[in-house]
């Protein structure tokens, strides 16, 4: 696996060896501290001129140059217009900086800009961007550093910033969030022959060491609860299903919890309605929603969030054996509502139907947010830069949208309505699990809405963003961990501010 850098914060100092990284604004402006870090201002101007570097956000320039103090390499990182930087931009700056340090074991980043005060939380976001950029899933590669020129040791990075106390304090929180994102990425990247429902549940149980209460329900308990929708999906696999309930109690008193529910199909062949062979290997990531919920619970516990939160994940494998669910089957969900199975590849909503009802019925939460790699249709509508947002509550939808804007994990709201709801009515049961080609992501959301009652609820369709999304400055991984930072920000803004 990747070597995670060790990051510390310091007052401004002249780097003594290794790599010196400095910030440059659009148009070439830089702080006096940056000039001191590399020896003189002319070096920065010369490197920028030779490289055609303009200081645009996320762009870099580098030179193998020594300084009187012993630095061997200088890296310039563009920040664009300093007055317009947001949280996501500071992550981009950190990720861009990390991308240029190579095999260096000692790095000093001078975090200063002309006529600009960089706050402690902004410095922490830079550090978070570096940690997230350092991530690499290479667990199964037997030849690593000798082939790829990777460093033998993790980089030691010193970030020089004016307010070191605030930066350290903010990074304690950011590092817990990084742990959650990395866990989500690891779970999604893991191959399905290694990570089945049982193994996933075991990973979730490890959160107990952070103070999370974890309960794992097996097939016997699920049958007793009447989870016919979830069990119908699982019956084609020899690997038994699991429902994992994670509880974090961080609020004072007995406040009603907030709840997060994740779809955890550890591998999705499509079942009897089998998928085409091309790219089916990507369906190891069809548990991206469950991975995000697990990563979120780790982040909340790791930073001791002052909130009561519930995470519920339904874990199954969708396989086409002789006992598999068939098109035309009718199953009874835990809610008592019956479902005609039109397409066994519309299985995620069946898993979520029971998980949502269970969560709502048992915990009576303030709201429920579910995440799922639910439909290809949402990718047709939105591509891979936004996840689909559906909600029965405008206030919750607005809060989620704002959290997405501030973290860069962006959402776009799509409609719900009675016209779409009628499309999932069935001739033979209360509803059907697929309404056909048109409005596929919307009718899937309408299906889920039938299992949450009047509770404020939002559904995030992360099919385009949880895996295989375009790389950026702080994520080069196939699995992005999308949703962890977004929902952590929602919790901070709405319950801890």
From Swiss-Prot:
UniProt: Mn(2+) 2 binding residues: 263, 268, 286, 347
Pfam families registered for this protein in UniProt: Peptidase_M17 (PF00883), Peptidase_M17_N (PF02789)
UniProt entry keywords in alphabetical sequence: Aminopeptidase, Cytoplasm, Hydrolase, Manganese, Metal-binding, Protease
Catalysed reaction, written as an equation: Release of an N-terminal amino acid, Xaa-|-Yaa-, in which Xaa is preferably Leu, but may be other amino acids including Pro although not Arg or Lys, and Yaa may be Pro. Amino acid amides and methyl esters are also readily hydrolyzed, but rates on arylamides are exceedingly low; Release of an N-terminal amino acid, preferentially leucine, but not glutamic or aspartic acids
Listed cofactors: Mn(2+)
Catalytic machinery residues: 275, 349
Positions contributing to Mn(2+) 1 binding: 268, 345, 347
CC cofactor note: Binds 2 manganese ions per subunit.
One GO cellular component term noted in the UniProt record for this chain: cytoplasm
Gene3D superfamilies assigned: Leucine Aminopeptidase, subunit E, domain 1, Zn peptidases
Source taxon at top rank: Bacteria
Any one Gene Ontology molecular-function term assigned to this protein's record: manganese ion binding
Subcellular localization: Cytoplasm
E.C. no: 3.4.11.1, 3.4.11.10
Example GO biological process: proteolysis
Membrane recorded as keyword: no
Family: Belongs to the peptidase M17 family.
Function field: Presumably involved in the processing and regular turnover of intracellular proteins. Catalyzes the removal of unsubstituted N-terminal amino acids from various peptides.
Protein's name according to its UniProt entry: Probable cytosol aminopeptidase
Species this protein is from: Brucella ovis (strain ATCC 25840 / 63/290 / NCTC 10512)
Organism phylogeny: Bacteria, Pseudomonadati, Pseudomonadota, Alphaproteobacteria, Hyphomicrobiales
Gene: pepA
């Amino acid at each position: 696996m990747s070597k995670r850098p060790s990051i510390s914060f310091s007052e401004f100092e002249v780097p003594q060896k290794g790599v010196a990284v400095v910030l440059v604004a659009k148009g070439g402006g830089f702080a006096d501290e940056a000039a001191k870090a590399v020896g003189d201002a002319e070096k920065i101007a010369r490197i920028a001129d030779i490289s055609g570097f303009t200081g645009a956000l996320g762009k870099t320039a580098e030179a193998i140059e020594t300084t009187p103090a012993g630095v061997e390499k200088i890296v310039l990182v563009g920040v664009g217009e300093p007055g317009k930087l947001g949280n996501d931009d500071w992550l981009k700056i950190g990720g861009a900086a990390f991308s240029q340090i190579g095999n260096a074991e000692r790095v000093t980043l001078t975090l200063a800009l002309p006529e600009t005060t960089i706050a402690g939380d902004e410095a922490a976001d830079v550090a978070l961007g570096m940690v997230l950029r350092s991530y690499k899933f290479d667990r199964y590669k037997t030849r690593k550093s000798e082939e790829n020129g990777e460093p033998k040791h993790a980089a030691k990075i010193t970030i020089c910033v004016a307010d070191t106390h605030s930066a350290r304090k903010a990074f304690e929180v950011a590092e817990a969030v990084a742990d959650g994102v990395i866990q989500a990425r690891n779970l999604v990247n893991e191959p399905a022959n290694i990570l089945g429902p049982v193994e996933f549940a075991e990973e979730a149980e490890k959160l107990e060491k952070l103070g999370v209460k974890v309960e794992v329900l097996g097939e016997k308990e699920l049958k007793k609860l009447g989870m016919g929708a979830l069990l119908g999906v699982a019956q084609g696999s020899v690997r038994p299903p699991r429902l994992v309930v994670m509880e974090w109690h961080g609020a004072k008193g007995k406040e009603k919890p907030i709840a997060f529910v994740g779809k955890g199909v550890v591998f999705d062949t499509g079942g009897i309605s089998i998928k085409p062979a091309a790219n089916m290997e990507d369906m190891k990531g069809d548990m991206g929603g469950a991975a995000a919920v697990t990563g979120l619970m780790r982040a909340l516990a790791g930073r001791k969030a002052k909130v009561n939160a519930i995470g519920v994940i339904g874990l199954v494998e969708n396989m086409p054996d002789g006992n598999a669910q068939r098109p035309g089957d009718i199953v009874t969900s835990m809610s008592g509502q019956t479902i005609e199975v039109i397409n066994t590849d519309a299985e995620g909503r069946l898993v979520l139907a029971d998980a949502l009802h269970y969560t709502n019925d048992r915990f009576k939460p303030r709201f429920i947010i579910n995440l799922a790699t639910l439909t290809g249709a949402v990718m047709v509508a939105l591509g891979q830069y936004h996840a689909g947002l559906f909600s029965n509550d405008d206030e919750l939808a607005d809060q989620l949208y704002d959290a997405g804007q501030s973290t860069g994990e962006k959402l776009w709201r799509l409609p719900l309505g009675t016209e779409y709801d009628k499309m999932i009515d069935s001739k033979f049961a209360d509803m059907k699990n697929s309404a056909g080609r048109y409005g596929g992501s919307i009718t899937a959301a309408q299906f889920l809405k039938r299992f949450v009652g009047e509770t404020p609820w939002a559904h995030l369709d992360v099919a385009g963003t949880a895996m295989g999304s375009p790389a950026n400055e702080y994520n080069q991984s196939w699995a992005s961990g999308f949703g962890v930072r977004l929902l952590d920000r929602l919790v901070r803004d709405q319950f801890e501010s």
